[in-house]
Amino acid sequence: MSTEKKIPYKIYLEENEMPTQWYNVRADMKNKPAPLLNPGTLKPMTFEELQPVFCDELVRQELDNDTLYFDIPQEIQDFYKMYRPSPLVRAYFLEKALGTPAKIYYKFEGNNTSGSHKLNSAIAQAYYAKKQGLTGVTTETGAGQWGTALSMACSYFDLDCKVYMVKVSYEQKPFRREVMRTYGASVTPSPSETTEVGRRILAEHPGTSGSLGCAISEAVEAATSRSGYRYVLGSVLSQVLLHQSIIGLETKAALDKYDIKADIVIGCAGGGSNLGGLISPFVGEKIKGEADYRIIAVEPASCPSLTRGRYAYDFCDTGMICPLAKMYTLGSGFIPSANHAGGLRYHGMSSVVSQLYDDKLIEAVSVEQTEVFAAAEQFARVEGILPAPESSHAIRVAIDEALKCKETGEEKTIVFGLTGTGYFDMVAYGKYNDGEMTDYIPTDSDLEPGFAGLPKID
């Protein structure tokens, strides 16, 4: 097996080559993402209105569409060096197994205890909370990677951490729950009886397996009902995509180091944190006309926000207590089926990603979970990494694109984000291996109630 042009299996940046600034793609966007709206006044949210919910510096980052780069504080840079720079891996073995002329690379973000990219933003948000003198933070988590990452970050800065975990994942992934507790976090299955909004959701949807929207509502209520606490979010918000830009910046630097030009960039899409972070420098070049890339967002067919959602203002949470965001959404009342990609079970999408999609700078596809797990197992057997179900959505489409190259003979360069590992997802792998996994694709009538509940905004 040759490594033409002496491209190694793993491309690592040196520590002194790591980015020292986050890139704010909003500053380069011709059409800025629509502002968050106050659900009461329907006017853009102000700094003062967001202050009770988020840390002050994070509010500033959230509202800033113009600053191109933000300096990464030295303390955060030092923490990053525990697990960054992360490798850009040439998937030589996958290429050989597929018999494709395509060149496949993946950015591996699973080389830390959280098992995912989520630590990139968790440590930033915990840093700003500590700097503000807060007691602790609250949050939601789907599959548990974000909750794990935040518990690690809070432990590092000696902050209290309260996590509301989507009930289906709380039950399916007890080991990830215990990792959070090991780092000092308290973990509550959502929806729960511990909050007013949780009790209301349980009354309206008895036996529900929960959703990220439900967990967000509970975490926000828990933060705003006690002093010294703020809410932090693992995805969706512009501030999170800002912190996650380190993924794309490192990826671009690693490619440039070997004069590699990507043709296709692929990321899984739930709320948009990994996707937005990975694609940011690539889409920035595309906006400025400096390069052209096919950028593909991959979402589950059971929760198809981009491919079947509506571009409208909607609540970010099921309890309708958060600001309104303009995004591709299935409606805040939409509760997805209990699929095995808990991190992608969100009714909406980042406003930044939504605007990029609406402007046709990126495209989107949805895939069924049985096909996703087929790709996951194929990848695991040849590349030696057990991928998370979320990441495996990107693997599925990367394989599909590589097989298209096999048909056409094109030597395209495909880059995808391997967001994390699947070692705590063995219930899902077991269902697949036993032939018990099923696909659920909502019908139009299934989606209609969510759309009917969208806020009426002139």
Q: Residue locations for each model-derived region?
A:
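Claisen-condensing/thiolase-fold acyl-transfer catalytic domains that form or cleave C-C bonds
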Residues: 269-277, 369-435
